[in-house]
Regions:
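Class I SAM-dependent methyltransferase SAM/SAH-binding core
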Residues: 67-69, 73-127
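Conserved beta-strand signature within the Rossmann-like core of class I S-adenosyl-L-methionine
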Residues: 164-171
C-alpha cells in the first residue's frame, strides 16, 4: 500500500511539473538547454521515440539529401546519416552551437567512424541557409512547438523542400510543448502541405505532409 502511495505521488509530482513547465514555456520561449542532452540521449528515449521508427515514418531513404530542424545533440541525426549512406547527406540545423558540438564529439567515437555525410549548421529555422527545393525530406522531433512562430518555420521548410518532398513532425506527450495531433495537422495544412498521414498513436506520433 505504501509503495502504491509513493508511486501515486511520483506521478502527481511529474504531472504537476509538466503542467508548470508547459505554462512557463507558453510565456517564455526558449530552446532546450544543452545540459538536457543527458536526457535527450538516454536509452529510455530510444524506447519511446525509436530513431528507426522516426526514420521510417519520415520516408528517409538511402541517397537522399535531408534536413533536421532542431537536431540537438544528434540523437536522430546520426542514425539517419547511417541510413542515407555515402551518397546521401543530412544537414543538422540548430540554433545552439553547444548542441552541434555534441554531434561533432559523437562522430569521434569508434561506433560512428566513417560517417562523413553530416553537415552541422548553426542557424535560425526562420532563415534556413539553403536555396529553394534543396531537400528530399525535412524532419523535426519535439522541437517545432517550442519555437515562437512555428508557421514561419514550416513556410521555410516548404521553401527548401523539393516538389514532392516530405515534411515530418514527431511529438511525444511528456514534452511540455506537446501539441494535439490535430494542431500539427492544421499547421501543416496552413503552410501548404498536402496528403497528410499520421503514424503512431495519440500520445506518440509522427505526422507527414507532402509539398
Amino acid at each position: 500500500m505504501i509503495i502504491l502511495e509513493i508511486l501515486l505521488w511520483i506521478v502527481i509530482v511529474l504531472v504537476a511539473f509538466r503542467i508548470l513547465i508547459g505554462i512557463v514555456r507558453k510565456l517564455i520561449h526558449f530552446p532546450a538547454p544543452a545540459f538536457i542532452s543527458i536526457f535527450l540521449d538516454s536509452k529510455a528515449r530510444g524506447w519511446w521515440q525509436p530513431p528507426k521508427d522516426i526514420i521510417r515514418f519520415s520516408n528517409i531513404k538511402k541517397g537522399m539529401k535531408i534536413l533536421e530542424i532542431g537536431s540537438g545533440s544528434g540523437f536522430f541525426t546520426i542514425p539517419a546519416a547511417k541510413v542515407l549512406g555515402y551518397d546521401g547527406e543530412i544537414a543538422a540545423l540548430d540554433i545552439q552551437q553547444e548542441m552541434l558540438d555534441k554531434i561533432t564529439k559523437k562522430l569521434e567515437k569508434e561506433e560512428n567512424s566513417g560517417i562523413e555525410n553530416i553537415r552541422c549548421v548553426k542557424a535560425s529555422a526562420y532563415e534556413i541557409p539553403y536555396p529553394a527545393e534543396t531537400f528530399d525530406v525535412v524532419f523535426t522531433v519535439s522541437v517545432l512547438q517550442e519555437i515562437p512562430k512555428p508557421h514561419d518555420v514550416l513556410l521555410e521548410a516548404h521553401r527548401v523542400l523539393k516538389k514532392g518532398g516530405t515534411m515530418s513532425i514527431s511529438e511525444f506527450i511528456p514534452d511540455p510543448d506537446w501539441p494535439l495531433p490535430s494542431t500539427v495537422e492544421k499547421q501543416l495544412t496552413a503552410a501548404g502541405f498536402k496528403n497528410l498521414k499520421k503514424h503512431g498513436n495519440f500520445f506518440r506520433y509522427t505526422i507527414t505532409g507532402v509539398k
